[in-house]
């Protein structure tokens, strides 16, 4: 029996229903996948324009661009504010320091960069460079830091664990350049050189103000991500630990030192001499004085012995009978 025209379903109802279901499913999936792949120390939610995923750094609450590396200043602030019971977040050990002064709670500007003056939420202040490392003596709140001095040269000094033989320098160079290009998205031109003398590896990163274009990853941020990877505290979301291999052979790093060179030399006074350095100087001076004293005493003893021998010989000559 033929149906009446009022009973026939509209031909577009089913496709429209499928589109609605697909949209809802896609939106739910987007919410489930709302994470920041380049920074796990973020809080993400689909509250951006059009319901897009938006991530904000812990501590500062600033929105971050998850298509590139997060600035080191925002990362340090996030590490300082991370709750102790947050198992999914990086909590640095007491010995995981970025410089000799250790970890501190930095002040960041609206672009996520370090402010030139840092006080660690106290009345003690100092000036830092673009990577947040102290470059002056510490002072009080009256201390002035006129500009944020850029770090244009970073030397990463590594020591790898003993291996059966030395790595091929060319293969090692190529692997480390690939790592910085693919994992840290640093333009190859900023990896100036890779040096190798078993077991020491040195990676030189160079980037001055005129070379860095909009969108370029900063060498300070790349070096910091690399440092955290090496120490087993990766900042990337959902990625495994760093697995470095050269021609299939694992490259295991056991020591990392990072040196920073600024465009303007740092300003430290003699107060920067540490107790250890002063102790070394004192030991050297004492050793020199002791050595000189021993030398003088030895010379005097030798001189006195010669005089006694001469006097004895003269006495014997006087006792001999004359012919």
Swiss-Prot record:
<feature type="disulfide bond">
    <location>
        <begin position="127"/>
        <end position="145"/>
    </location>
</feature>
<dbReference type="GO" id="GO:1900025">
    <property type="term" value="P:negative regulation of substrate adhesion-dependent cell spreading"/>
</dbReference>
<dbReference type="GO" id="GO:2000738">
    <property type="term" value="P:positive regulation of stem cell differentiation"/>
</dbReference>
<dbReference type="GO" id="GO:0016020">
    <property type="term" value="C:membrane"/>
</dbReference>
<feature type="domain" description="Thyroglobulin type-1">
    <location>
        <begin position="70"/>
        <end position="145"/>
    </location>
</feature>
<keyword id="KW-1008">Amyloidosis</keyword>
<dbReference type="GO" id="GO:0050678">
    <property type="term" value="P:regulation of epithelial cell proliferation"/>
</dbReference>
<dbReference type="GO" id="GO:0070062">
    <property type="term" value="C:extracellular exosome"/>
</dbReference>
<feature type="glycosylation site" description="N-linked (GlcNAc...) asparagine">
    <location>
        <position position="208"/>
    </location>
</feature>
<feature type="glycosylation site" description="N-linked (GlcNAc...) asparagine">
    <location>
        <position position="33"/>
    </location>
</feature>
<feature type="topological domain" description="Extracellular">
    <location>
        <begin position="27"/>
        <end position="274"/>
    </location>
</feature>
<dbReference type="Pfam" id="PF21283">
    <property type="entry name" value="EPCAM-Trop-2_C"/>
</dbReference>
<dbReference type="InterPro" id="IPR043406">
    <property type="entry name" value="EPCAM/Trop-2"/>
</dbReference>
<keyword id="KW-0472">Membrane</keyword>
<dbReference type="Pfam" id="PF00086">
    <property type="entry name" value="Thyroglobulin_1"/>
</dbReference>
<feature type="disulfide bond">
    <location>
        <begin position="119"/>
        <end position="125"/>
    </location>
</feature>
<keyword id="KW-1015">Disulfide bond</keyword>
<keyword id="KW-0034">Amyloid</keyword>
<protein>
    <recommendedName>
        <fullName>Tumor-associated calcium signal transducer 2</fullName>
    </recommendedName>
</protein>
<keyword id="KW-1212">Corneal dystrophy</keyword>
<dbReference type="GO" id="GO:0016328">
    <property type="term" value="C:lateral plasma membrane"/>
</dbReference>
<dbReference type="InterPro" id="IPR036857">
    <property type="entry name" value="Thyroglobulin_1_sf"/>
</dbReference>
<keyword id="KW-0812">Transmembrane</keyword>
<dbReference type="GO" id="GO:0007601">
    <property type="term" value="P:visual perception"/>
</dbReference>
<feature type="glycosylation site" description="N-linked (GlcNAc...) asparagine">
    <location>
        <position position="168"/>
    </location>
</feature>
<dbReference type="Pfam" id="PF18635">
    <property type="entry name" value="EpCAM_N"/>
</dbReference>
<keyword id="KW-0825">Tumor antigen</keyword>
<dbReference type="GO" id="GO:0005634">
    <property type="term" value="C:nucleus"/>
</dbReference>
<comment type="similarity">
    <text>Belongs to the EPCAM family.</text>
</comment>
<dbReference type="GO" id="GO:0010633">
    <property type="term" value="P:negative regulation of epithelial cell migration"/>
</dbReference>
<dbReference type="InterPro" id="IPR041630">
    <property type="entry name" value="EpCAM_N"/>
</dbReference>
<dbReference type="GO" id="GO:0051497">
    <property type="term" value="P:negative regulation of stress fiber assembly"/>
</dbReference>
<dbReference type="GO" id="GO:0005615">
    <property type="term" value="C:extracellular space"/>
</dbReference>
<dbReference type="GO" id="GO:2000146">
    <property type="term" value="P:negative regulation of cell motility"/>
</dbReference>
<dbReference type="GO" id="GO:0005829">
    <property type="term" value="C:cytosol"/>
</dbReference>
<dbReference type="GO" id="GO:1900028">
    <property type="term" value="P:negative regulation of ruffle assembly"/>
</dbReference>
<feature type="disulfide bond">
    <location>
        <begin position="73"/>
        <end position="108"/>
    </location>
</feature>
<dbReference type="GO" id="GO:0090191">
    <property type="term" value="P:negative regulation of branching involved in ureteric bud morphogenesis"/>
</dbReference>
<keyword id="KW-0844">Vision</keyword>
<keyword id="KW-1133">Transmembrane helix</keyword>
<feature type="signal peptide">
    <location>
        <begin position="1"/>
        <end position="26"/>
    </location>
</feature>
<feature type="transmembrane region" description="Helical">
    <location>
        <begin position="275"/>
        <end position="297"/>
    </location>
</feature>
